[in-house]
Amino acid sequence: MQPPTQPGHGAITVQVAPNPIVAQPVTGNVYDFPFDVIVRETGGRAVNITRVTADVTAIGGIRVAQDAYDAAKINSLGFPTTLAPNGELRYHFSPRRSVPDESLFSGVSAELTVDATDETSTATSARTTVTVRR
């Protein structure tokens, strides 16, 4: 779901690839969950990405994981946080998690949210939901 654009301010959309996110076995019950977050600026103004969050839920809406990356953490991973007007950024994440029961892969989804501000400090955000599978 993308919020409405405020005229004269920065706005963003977000996409996750691949969708679904496919768990990659590491060893035993440990998996990597590699995915890219693609952020596009659509309002014609530069924005600064302030936060990327992922809330992972299983059947019944039970939260099974949460990751948050603030601007400092995104920069420490070697990614820029400044997005040019009408530009695009791609962030690659690959969190590693233990999955004690393979049945948890059934009905798992992740809601990804990207928060940003433009040069007038006007906040904008975008979110999308993807599925996760083995």
Predicted feature descriptions by range:
Residues 39-43:
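Asparagine-centered strand-capping/turn motif at beta-strand->loop junctions
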Residues 12-27:
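A structural motif detector for short, solvent-exposed N-terminal "entry" segments of globular domains
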Residues 17-18, 29-36, 107-110:
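Short, solvent-exposed loop/turn segments enriched in Ser/Thr/Gly
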Residues 99-134:
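Terminal connector regions
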Residues 44-53:
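Short, hydrophobic/aromatic beta-strand segments
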